[in-house]
Amino acid sequence: MCLHQKPACVCKRNKAYIFHRDSVLPERVVINLYCPECRDRTNRDQSTMIEDVGWLIEYDMEVARFYLELKGVDHPVTPEFIFDEGYCTWYGMSPNDLEENARVHQELLPLQKKDKLLYFNELKRIRLAQFAELKKTGWRKAQNI
């Protein structure tokens, strides 16, 4: 089972779904979350923060190193490593991808009851288009699609 959380950003106007691969890192590894509206409240520290299309996640690097070493991870622990390897990253491709996915499923629910094949094809078409847009916009996780 993998841990996930939905913390509010510093200004409390936005929230992001955050996923913790294999529950290796505890929730407290996220010190602060900054949305595009409140990111100016801090100076980006590359040694503790990852940036993704205007969002910043600030990690407690001591906590991250401790838990990753306990797990036997033999790799330099950086914010990029933590994020890109999924140890503490978006749940989906972006901060709100989980909600967007749920919205699409809800929207297509009537189709699912009528024609499952058409439902799956439409779901695939919509999600692939969304992923292409996320990639074009520059979302970090979407770049590997």
What is each stretch, according to the model?
Residues 15-19, 44-45:
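Short, non-ligating residues that shape and space the ligands of small metal-coordination modules
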Residues 1-2, 29-57, 63-71:
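Short metal-binding segments enriched for Cys and/or His
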Residues 3-7:
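Short structural boundary motif marking the start of a folded domain
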Residues 20-32:
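Short linker/helix segments within small regulatory modules
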Residues 8-13, 37:
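Short, cysteine/histidine-rich loop/knuckle motifs that typically chelate Zn2+
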Residues 21-24, 47-50, 97:
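A short, sequence-level motif marking secondary-structure junctions
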Residues 13-15, 61:
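Charged, glycine-enriched surface loops/patches
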Residues 65-145:
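Long, contiguous alpha-helical scaffold regions
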